[in-house]
A protein has these predicted regions:
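Forkhead-associated
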Residues: 21-94
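Intrinsically disordered, low-complexity acidic Ser/Thr-rich regulatory segments
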Residues: 1-42, 105-120
Length: 120
């Protein structure tokens, strides 16, 4: 996989029927579920039609379970909502997704700033 550009946020499907798929999180809210209109379409009976959302709030990305039947997990722990950091594993049904982010560099001595959709 090519290097992630500074300021980018990406979800990579590591396990599940569409392993290897990548989704750029470039909106304030990105939906994930079995509904064909989902931003991240996960087509399996273990996934609710409207399962979870990835939200950019208060300069952080959150994953929020939106009433799924089988729960949403972060690093193998069930969550209603959780702040995501680089490398976290999000499980939605049988799908395992990796959250990847690369902070924007603003020059200076190692100064970084987490970027999200509002910064673009």
């Amino acid at each position: 996989m090519p290097a992630l550009p500074p300021g980018s946020v990406l979800i990579v499907v590591k396990r599940g029927p569409n392993a290897g798929s990548r989704f750029l999180l470039d909106q304030p809210v990105t939906s994930a579920g079995r509904h064909p209109g989902s931003d991240i379409f996960l087509d399996d009976v273990t996934v609710s039609r409207r399962h979870a959302e990835f939200r950019w709030e208060n300069d952080e990305f959150h994953v929020v379970d939106v009433g799924s039947l089988n729960s949403t997990y972060v690093n193998r722990e069930p969550v209603d909502s959780a702040v995501l950091v680089n490398g976290d594993e999000v499980q939605i049904g049988k799908f395992r997704l990796t959250f990847l982010t690369k902070p924007k560099n603003h020059g200076g001595a190692g100064g970084t700033h987490d970027s999200g959709p509002a910064d673009r």
